[in-house]
Amino acid sequence: MTKLSVNINKVATLRNARGGNVPNVVKVALDCESFGADGITVHPRPDERHIRRSDVYDLRPLLRTEFNIEGYPSPEFIDLVLKVKPHQVTLVPDDPSQITSNSGWDTKVNFDFLTEVLDEFNGAGIRTSVFVAPDAEMIEYAAKAGADRVELYTEPYATAYPKDPAAAVAPFVEAAKAARRLGIGLNAGHDLSLLNLNYFYKNIPWLDEVSIGHALISDALYLGLERTIQEYKNCLR
């Protein structure tokens, strides 16, 4: 079964726009779990423009499903993850100033750095995932570096899907097959939505997890959070 992890960064963005604690990030996360989410994802950035370090500490003891923390492995991020000990850490190559993730790691160029970071997290018993493009070589070096999983960067799929779904998904199917041959787990995320998720899943049914935030929270404005989560879960069947 492919798990749905809900990224709640956009909820924190809304809270921070006004100040105060509305919406309550922790309550929304717990409600997502109650409505069927299999996990919660957060991406704390150094400027805390959405998720704050305090949110991460508040969430950890209360969540009943898997907790995934994603981010660039700066010393501060590594320290946070080792203290919180989530179920999974996802390493992304973001510059702190980026609005959102827009590329995967070059795992060959960054092999030594990633190996060192992954070794630290693996030693703490935290499942590790590395954000990569759908490229067999990048997946191979992620596996060699010690990653338990890779997360495929799916924005190119989402962009190409409306014009030619088969062509859009083809490189991801090949990448997924490469991951399976290497014995490494497979996650996916970025711009997956109700429009394109089911087709992606049908072509790669051995996906372990998808992480979805922006589209899901946007859909919830119209459909409500509970119905939206169920709609996304239905796309993974």
From Swiss-Prot:
Active-site residues from the entry: H43, E70, H190
Binding residues for 1-deoxy-D-xylulose 5-phosphate: R45, H50, T100
Enzymatic reactions: 3-amino-2-oxopropyl phosphate + 1-deoxy-D-xylulose 5-phosphate = pyridoxine 5'-phosphate + phosphate + 2 H2O + H(+)
Protein name per UniProt: Pyridoxine 5'-phosphate synthase
Complex formation: Homooctamer; tetramer of dimers.
Location of the protein in the cell: Cytoplasm
Binding site for 3-amino-2-oxopropyl phosphate: N7, R18, D191, G213, H214
EC number: 2.6.99.2
Higher taxonomy: Bacteria, Pseudomonadati, Bacteroidota, Bacteroidia, Bacteroidales
Predominant cellular place of this UniProt entry's protein: cytoplasm
Organism whose genome encodes this protein: Bacteroides fragilis (strain YCH46)
